Amino acid sequence: MTVIKKGKNKKKNLKNDDRYKELDSLITNGSEIGDNSGRSCIKRFFKIIGNEMKNNVYVYFLSILYLCVCVMNKVFAKRTLNKMGNYSFVTSETHNIICIVVFQLLYFIYRKTSTSGYKNESQKNFGWQFFLISLLDASTVIISMIGLTRTTGNIQSFIMQLIIPVNMYFCFMFLGYRYHLFNYLGAFIILITIAVVETFLSFETQSENSIIFNLIMISALIPLSFSNMTREVVFKKHKINILRLNAMVVLFQFFTSLLVLPVYNIPFLKEIYMPFSEMSTNINNGLRCLFYGQNTVVENCGVGMVKMCDNCEGAWKTFITFSFFNICDNLLACYIIDKFSTMTYTIVSCIQGPAITIAYYFKFLAGDAVRKPRILDFLTLFGYLFGTIIYRIGNIILEKKKMVKSQNSNDSEAELTCIETSTA
């Protein structure tokens, strides 16, 4: 039986090893290439990319799908903000209620159609994990709201992409991740692309920008990173269902979002500043704006003013569309973290920056927020994609080493078992 098991392991390892042959050829024979070294190296490089995409069609399809959903989520979030930006608390809590209903309904259907999986999960209590994720998400929102008040658009984009090194560091420290040189190189290329582009765009940056508030916004990446890592631990260690996680987290989030209320009473927050005495009036006006399309703030508002002008006509359509894509975004993000890792999710999501910018070129997507195309945006997207490819090559090499190590371990155990059997 041991010999048969050993044969199966060899067959499996040989099958898995096929995808790495081209990579081995590129690395091993790199020094043996003659006059056509450059052309041969490029040819091999693109052949590796082709084989990688062919062997991981599902991964790349899922990544593209998530990227499209994520872009639509951000675009319609911006369009919702343009219509009813004075009522962020109303939109936040209404969206939470919609998410509670949808996720609870989906999880109810899952329980009815998959009884065995539900029974296995129902024996475990994940209350503190749900509360921790909700609290981390609420903390991210609160800190980001404070930082955003004096952090201009271009700097916002740069700061959000810093999640790559932040996630790499915390995954290294707490989840035991180990990286290849190509992982660092890919992340470095992405960061350099961001730095160059944002430096170039800094000439367009508004004067109202504070380094203190920039640092506050950067600190929001810490709870965001820990939230993603907690999700990964819950998925990988406890094998919890994605629908159950989202159903419970959004339920906790409805209450943890109330922690945001004191933030609205901080005077230096300018646009979102709102005393507690005006809270009930704001909620009432927000509900009228969302469900009845009634404008309340129409005077002393607009560009350069403290408040935005209401544009509530058709607000509910834009808001429902945003909620739909946001729910899909959450499900796909959790699925990617569950099936792959936090870093895979981070690298895929970082491409959304230039993709969102390009989406604003199309009026049917961006509406009133449409912008003119710029070559710089396409160059940024190319830099992101190139860095992502280099990062993925690092993962391939690490997978190869892990597979070889596992193969050697299986062979050693099989040989030891055979020796013990023959001795007996």
Swiss-Prot record:
GO cellular component: vacuolar membrane
Locations listed in the record: Vacuole membrane
S-S bridge residues: C289-C312, C301-C309
InterPro entries reported for this sequence: CRT-like (IPR013936), Transprt_Chloroquine (IPR017258)
Regions crossing the membrane: 57-77, 89-109, 126-146, 157-177, 181-201, 210-230, 249-269, 318-338, 347-367, 378-398
Keyword Transmembrane helix assigned: yes
One Pfam family in the UniProt entry: CRT-like
Residue ranges annotated as Vacuolar topological domain: 78-88, 147-156, 202-209, 270-317, 368-377
GO biological process: amino acid transport
MF term (GO), any: xenobiotic transmembrane transporter activity
Transmembrane helix in keyword set: yes
Function (record text): Nutrient transporter. Involved in maintaining the osmotic homeostasis of the digestive vacuole.
Entry similarity comment: Belongs to the CRT-like transporter family.
Name the UniProt record assigns to this protein: Putative chloroquine resistance transporter
Protein encoded by which gene: CRT
